[in-house]
Amino acid sequence: MRLINFDETSDWFEAFHRLEALLDKKRSKGKMVVFIDELPWLDTPRAKFLSAFEHFWNDWGAGKHNLLLIVCGSATSWMLDNLINNKGGLYGRTNCEMHLHPFTLAETETYLHRRGVTLDRYDVVQTYMLTGGVAYYLSYFQPGLSLAENIDAIYFAENGFLQTEYDRLFTSLFADNAGYRRIVETLSENRYGLTREALAEKAGIALGGTLSNMLKALVKSDLVTIYWNFGESKRTQYYKLTDMFCLFYLGFVQRNPTNNRTYWYDNQNRSRSEERRVGKECRS
């Protein structure tokens, strides 16, 4: 049921005023829930969405004790800068954060099984290592195909579902994503991670608040992990790329020079042939 015709509203201020009027008409003493999905994408240039949203909550919503406002968004940097760490009209307004994490290895196995994708545990581990347990990526695995056939169809075939996902990932998570990509791609070439200073030098990004904020957003997005080396000072932090999809994409998909659409299947067969050859040499 469409309760508000947004085609007839002149701006976001009017849209929120209409929402207020609609909720006032209900005069409900029970809990009322307003859910706004993908909040960052509503804040387009010159839309003044954030100002209207602040006005809606501070002047009306915050005083409604039976109103629960739930917002979500995949653009991590926007959510951090404009909502969670807001220093303006929305400062300190969030009551609870819910960070959605990917599936664990066990949950990945259960999900695949319930979708009818039959893989042995070795292949389930490989699947987890190239998807990171992200349900969206796992949803493209088709029953009846081997792991190699699924990987080729999803990552390497023409119009493969996840062939361009790397670009979409950064566009959806970060508004100005060039710096984030440089950080991730630099870390992908340094498997043991880098200190903040070494990362700044290798990625060509100046040390300072901008780099710090980008690293915080990457950590919050589960793309990068902070760790400390045993025996070193606690002040020496290392940043390591741990997102499995990015590692697989940068390590294999981006480096597929021949654009071979059966790359993984062929690579698997070559590996098996090499194993058989080595085995014969060892026995002779």
Regions found by a protein language model. Give the residues of each.
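Conserved small/polar residues in nucleotide/adenosyl-binding loops
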Residues: E275-C282
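Phosphate-binding site recognition
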Residues: M1-N269
